[in-house]
């Protein structure tokens, strides 16, 4: 059985720990902070076997060197082959190597090319779990620091095509703020209203809203539904000074991301 555990880091990061029972060797996803990972390993008598990196931002990679030293340079470190990340031992290209196997893990690890937030961002799927870094958030998506709106839209559409029961393990607890924006854009969405109430209740108890599921995100995430009639109407109303005669899905998505950036 694969167990997935969250380690909180910084203000709102999640570092995900993957453990295939009964093994005591584990993998971590995007360890921006080594100290919290080491504390978790030692408290649970676990050994770190490897690291999965989604992109180069320091809050996702900052702990790699210290964890490698802690593990006496025995770690396998996976990450995108077209981003400058110190410490990667196994650079990945999703086109050339879309699947691989990990020691101590059952089944294959699928690698997805999801540029947008950064130019080389990748995501991982193992069993029914998606680790998508800063590409897809619950109720939102990542800012476009390096990629284009077209790249991000394509990446999100790719993720939205995963099986509905796929669990979404993003890297930040941004759900509450994302849902505020989603409700401004899509106020009559009952599924969104219900999810917002659940998210508020969870955060009041200091509990994580993650993981989400692909099914839920298809229903409530405006960035997966940029061509929905109510969302298109909201975009046109918000950007009323623009000519929307030929507004297509990419144009709507671009304006939606611009709106969120200034929300």
Swiss-Prot record:
Family, per entry: Belongs to the metallo-beta-lactamase superfamily. Glyoxalase II family.
Record key words, sorted: Hydrolase, Metal-binding, Zinc
Subunit structure of this chain's protein: Monomer.
Function: Thiolesterase that catalyzes the hydrolysis of S-D-lactoyl-glutathione to form glutathione and D-lactic acid.
SUPFAM superfamilies: Metallo-hydrolase/oxidoreductase
Coiled-coil boundaries: none
Domain of life, source organism: Bacteria
Top enzyme category: hydrolase
One biological process term in Gene Ontology: methylglyoxal catabolic process to D-lactate via S-lactoyl-glutathione
Cofactor(s) recorded in Swiss-Prot or TrEMBL: Zn(2+)
Pathway it works in: Secondary metabolite metabolism; methylglyoxal degradation; (R)-lactate from methylglyoxal: step 2/2
A GO molecular-function descriptor: hydroxyacylglutathione hydrolase activity
EC number: 3.1.2.6
Gene from which the chain derives: gloB
Entry note: cofactor: Binds 2 Zn(2+) ions per subunit.
Catalytic activity, as annotated: an S-(2-hydroxyacyl)glutathione + H2O = a 2-hydroxy carboxylate + glutathione + H(+)
Binding annotation for Zn(2+) 2: 59-60, 134, 172
Protein name, as recorded: Hydroxyacylglutathione hydrolase
UniProt xrefs under CDD domains: hydroxyacylglutathione_hydrolase_MBL-fold
Residues noted as binding Zn(2+) 1 in the record, renumbered to the chain: 55, 57, 117, 134
């Amino acid at each position: 059985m694969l167990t997935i555990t969250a380690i909180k880091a910084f203000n709102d990061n999640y570092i995900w720990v993957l453990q295939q029972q009964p093994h005591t060797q584990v993998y971590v996803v995007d360890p921006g902070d080594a100290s919290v990972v080491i504390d978790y390993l030692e408290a649970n008598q676990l050994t770190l076997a490897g690291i999965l990196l989604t992109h180069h931002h320091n809050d996702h990679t900052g702990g790699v060197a210290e964890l490698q030293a802690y593990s006496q340079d025995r770690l396998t470190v996976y990450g995108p082959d077209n981003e400058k990340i110190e410490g990667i031992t196994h650079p990945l290209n999703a086109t050339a190597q879309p699947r691989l196997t990990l020691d101590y893990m059952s089944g294959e690890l699928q690698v997805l090319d999801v540029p947008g937030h950064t130019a080389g961002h990748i995501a991982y799927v193992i069993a029914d779990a998606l680790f998508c870094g800063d590409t897809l958030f619950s109720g939102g998506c990542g800012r476009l620091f390096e990629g284009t709106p077209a790249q991000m839209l394509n990446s999100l559409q790719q993720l939205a095509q995963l099986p509905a029961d796929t669990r979404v393990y993003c890297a930040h607890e941004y759900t509450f703020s994302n849902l505020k924006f989603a409700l401004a854009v899509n106020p009559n969405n009952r599924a969104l209203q219900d999810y917002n109430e659940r998210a508020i209740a969870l955060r009041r108890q200091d509990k994580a809203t993650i993981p989400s599921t692909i099914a839920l995100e298809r229903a409530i995430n405006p960035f997966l539904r940029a061509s929905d009639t109510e969302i298109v109407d909201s975009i046109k109303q918000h950007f009323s000074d623009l000519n929307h005669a030929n507004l297509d899905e990419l144009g709507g998505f671009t304006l939606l991301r611009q709106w969120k950036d200034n929300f």
